[in-house]
């Protein structure tokens, strides 16, 4: 019984087990993969030694995570592009609430002042005019 030839779908990539590049790897690529695996194993061993240390004091700091967080917080401009949409949203979120609160307070005071001038508002505890 013969199986039909595998045809990759347009929506999903070729599985790694069927990829010929998975098995035809150059020695340099294999060496680089082995070095990365050794570094990963060494870092994992150091972390586990720190994690399982019974005399541990404080937190275990991950230097890669610290570098990543520092780069994200201090290096904003390579990751941010000012566009008209960003500018408009910044203005709306920055000035929109201030204008809205000003409008509410102003209309409420104007309405109250109009009722006071017409004499329709009962001001039992008023201290001014």
From Swiss-Prot:
Pfam families, per the entry: NDUF_B4
Where N-acetylserine occurs, the residues are: 2
Compartments reported by the entry: Mitochondrion inner membrane
Q: Where is this region: Disordered?
A: 1-26
Q: Does the keyword tRNA processing apply?
A: no
Organism's domain of life? Eukaryota
Membrane-crossing segments per the record: 88-105
CC annotations in GO: mitochondrial inner membrane; respiratory chain complex I
Phosphoserine is found on 26
What broad class describes the main subcellular location of this protein?
A: mitochondrion
InterPro entries found in the cross-reference section: NADH_UbQ_OxRdtase_NDUFB4_su
Topology relative to the lipid bilayer, per the entry, is: Single-pass membrane protein
Q: Does the keyword Transmembrane apply?
A: yes
Give UniProt keywords alphabetically.
Acetylation, Electron transport, Membrane, Mitochondrion, Mitochondrion inner membrane, Phosphoprotein, Respiratory chain, Transmembrane, Transmembrane helix, Transport
Coiled coil location: none
Quaternary structure, per UniProt, is: Complex I is composed of 45 different subunits.
Main function: Accessory subunit of the mitochondrial membrane respiratory chain NADH dehydrogenase (Complex I), that is believed not to be involved in catalysis. Complex I functions in the transfer of electrons from NADH to the respiratory chain. The immediate electron acceptor for the enzyme is believed to be ubiquinone.
Similarity field: Belongs to the complex I NDUFB4 subunit family.
Q: What is the name listed in the Swiss-Prot or TrEMBL entry for this protein?
A: NADH dehydrogenase [ubiquinone] 1 beta subcomplex subunit 4
Q: Which organism is it from?
A: Pongo abelii
């Amino acid at each position: 019984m013969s199986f039909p030839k595998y045809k990759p779908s347009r929506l999903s990539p070729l599985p790694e087990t069927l990829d010929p590049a998975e098995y035809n790897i150059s020695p340099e690529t294999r060496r680089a993969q082995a070095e990365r695996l050794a570094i990963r194993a060494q870092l994992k061993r150091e972390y586990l030694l720190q994690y399982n240390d019974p005399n541990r004091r404080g937190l275990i700091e991950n230097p890669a995570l610290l570098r990543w967080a520092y780069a994200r917080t201090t290096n904003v401009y390579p990751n941010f592009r000012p566009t008209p949409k960003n500018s408009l949203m910044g203005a709306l979120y920055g000035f929109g609430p201030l204008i809205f609160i000003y409008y509410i307070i102003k209309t409420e005071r104007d309405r109250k002042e109009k009722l006071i001038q017409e004499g329709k508002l009962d001001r039992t505890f008023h201290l001014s005019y």
